[in-house]
């Protein structure tokens, strides 16, 4: 495949431009050529070497094909068996076609597994952040999230278990992509680590912005609410949850009873404490460790003081080696 400028398009660019592959980032060839980044993938992908060569646009070696063509020419010149020749050619070409289809599927699988690792690297997550700012991953379908941008994630790191899902950082829920063309994308190509790592890498993103607004930087916007809890800004912790953000089903203005068969269920999943400081596990851990250290130091000091009590009896007797006790009375020689 070639681009409009006449320069042949790489396999990676062609793969990412396919319909339904809009979530993918273009993995750099430097990342793929580093053997450390491919550790453990040889056993997961069939025809690993050929698939890797296809991804890197490396031309396969044609030595075997040339030898077979030379042998066929020699058979023609020597008047070999011409009856079996067409059948052999058909079998040879069918084998080549089947190998290409297997290599193509293996290349897609291998690229997906490499992509899972690449988007967790510095260069890969920066690429995904640019796509996130442009809204390439879509928005949350929940009304109270106000069109918060979503992130592609997988529910498993093992290929073939589930398709890609969209994680909303506003309501902390996972949704199926709205378009059916994404239902063929394996969720393992994005993995379970990317979503949390993205939010920890870019904590300054203002998640309260809607999909139509640009993602601003909390540190540059001069926001007063810059309280940090567990490494994240407090206003970015599930802004779509809590009081006033829980849907209440009503019929003609009357709330549907919770004990009704069609009543609301599991609304506690949308709840959030009013005081977010109770979620600050890092602060509580530091305080607990500090109190434990104080108790331990006090225990050590008390044990040291107890050891210092009861000096030797010789010191009470002015250290005289000639002082002895006889029947409870002291005498000197």
Swiss-Prot record:
Phosphorylated by alpha subunit. InterPro entries: Casein_kin_II_reg-sub_N, Casein_kinase_II_beta-like, Casein_kinase_II_reg-sub. It comes from the Eukaryota. Residues 58-92, 282-333 are annotated as: Disordered. Keywords: Phosphoprotein. GO terms for cellular component: cytoplasm; protein kinase CK2 complex; UTP-C complex. One of its GO terms (molecular function) is protein kinase regulator activity. Residues 58-78 have a biased composition (Acidic residues). Residues 305-316 have a biased composition (Basic residues). GO terms for biological process: regulation of transcription by RNA polymerase III. The keyword Phosphoprotein applies. Gene3D superfamilies: 2.20.25.20, protein kinase ck2 holoenzyme, chain C, domain 1. Pfam families: CK_II_beta. Regulatory subunit of casein kinase II/CK2. As part of the kinase complex regulates the basal catalytic activity of the alpha subunit a constitutively active serine/threonine-protein kinase that phosphorylates a large number of substrates containing acidic residues C-terminal to the phosphorylated serine or threonine. Belongs to the casein kinase 2 subunit beta family. Tetramer composed of two alpha chains, one beta chain and one beta' chain. This is Casein kinase II subunit beta-1. It comes from Neurospora crassa (strain ATCC 24698 / 74-OR23-1A / CBS 708.71 / DSM 1257 / FGSC 987). The lineage of its organism: Eukaryota, Fungi, Dikarya, Ascomycota, Pezizomycotina. The gene is ckb-1.
